[in-house]
Amino acid sequence: RPDDPVLVGSDYLATPETLSSDIGVKTFDEIDATYAAITGVDRVAYQVQVQGQTVFPVDETYQELRQSLPAIESAEAFLSSHQVAIAQLAIQYCDAAVEDNTIWPGLDFNTAKGTFFSGGNRDAFVEPLIQRAVGHSSSSTPILSQPSYVDVHGEVASFPAVGNRPENLIDRLVAGTSNTRAISKGVCASVLGSAATLVQ
């Protein structure tokens, strides 16, 4: 039997420059699976009729953007072009979710925006969206590696304007000229395209 190899010690010390990150970003297929899980939209099956033609807008967008989405999990390799592609895919998934009304069966997106986003209606819209994105609800224990429901809800639906801080996203959008469907899609896309769904 041969002798065991001699182990050689090293004086190598890891530095911040040589350590790899404990976090990364999801790759293109993970982003797609996450968006499908949050919105309830089946990318391949979702279809609409446009001028008598059947089109598959979510799948077409994904196939078009696939090479522009992150291919590796390294946060250092994340580019601004990745964020643009992520935003486009998030908007397409949210468009399908609102039009198909997959996770908000009790809500009517034809309601006037002032009524739709008032009081309890606002929470009926954001609660399932945020809960699916961060993995817990306003009344359950948060996942320590995720932003809290309260933080995401504040940014999207409840923070008032204070000092230099702007109002929450919904209030800013309701004050503009967009209708309920457009606002809902924008809010949905802001949650989907955020670090809450992309960082792992």
Predicted regions and their residues:
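Composition-driven recognition of low-complexity segments enriched
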Residues: R1-Q200
